[in-house]
Amino acid sequence: MAKRIVGSTPKQDGFRMPGEFEPQEKVWMIWPERPDNWRDGGKPVQEAFTNVAKAISQFTPMNVVVSQQQFQNCRRQLPPEITVYEMSNNDAWVRDCGPSFVINDHGEIRGVDWTFNAWGGLVDGLYFPWDQDDLVAQKICEIEHVDSYRTDDFVLEGGSFHVDGQGTVLTTEMCLLSEGRNPQLSKEAIEQKLCDYLNVEKVLWLGDGIDPEETNGHVDDVACFIAPGEVACIYTEDQNSPFYEAAQDAYQRLLKMTDAKGRQLKVHKLCCPVKNVTIKGSFKIDFVEGTMPREDGDICIASYMNFLITNDGVIVPQYGDENDHLALEQVQTMFPDKKIVGVNTVEVVYGGGNIHCITQQEPKR
């Protein structure tokens, strides 16, 4: 059985969140279906999710959760080696509503169940209701027989931070200090929450993310740890790029930062697409009051940074852009001992996310 842990934190109990580059037991996804977020009733994006899941399963066992209505369709589209569970949900962003797993030095694992409010709640959230998404982390922990910590007084999404597993967390001011999440907490109080529940000693703050309308600037589109003391950061010198200012600011900040161990960060550049990815065929997306509308010509958050590191592989977004191959080469340089797999995720970015957003790794115990 899985129980809730009250009156304590992972830090007090000797649990830490490992870096994404550390060994993984499995990866989780949620099957997409919302017709008010995905084109053509979700059919094109289901193909993209399937391709992402297949790519990951080359390196790590895959679990996919899906609503009752879509169970048979999901099961038919995914190969038999991928496990499928029925689970109610509001949408498909398991990085943000799923558990952040923490481990200790004795082979034990627990989950952190952050309060989820659809990226801003009633202030600027993307949809309502979000109650089923807020239960996903607890349900996954139940399936895995993993005890969990619930942060009832603290809203956070998994895509808003990256850890190095050695005491450092990377995040953005735009997201964590936004009005729709924890307006009752100071920046210092938010830092303390991160330290307590991720078991870190140092918080590295970037400024803005590149998606103010979607997630208020999640860091996983901008930068991530690729190894202890090493980070990747999006980079462009094209001043016409919608990502230029945020990318330049993040890169310059990272160059001056040290981690919790006192190491000067080594910063690797990762290119941006040459052309903007813009929404096409928005008439194929149902309009529903209370859900963020999507219009033709809207610029999507097409970042190569939103990749997933998983055991011996790295799964990287592709957009049919002339920089696709360069991005794969740059990621290969960052991970010389891993296989780099590109997957076209245009349909995913139409809905507001990417590979890292739709996956959640479970570390080895």
UniProtKB/Swiss-Prot annotation:
It catalyses: agmatine + H2O = N-carbamoylputrescine + NH4(+). The keyword Hydrolase applies. Keywords: Hydrolase. Tetramer of two homodimers. HAMAP family: Agmatine_deimin. PANTHER family: AGMATINE DEIMINASE-RELATED. This is Putative agmatine deiminase. It comes from Enterococcus faecalis (strain ATCC 700802 / V583). The lineage of its organism: Bacteria, Bacillati, Bacillota, Bacilli, Lactobacillales.
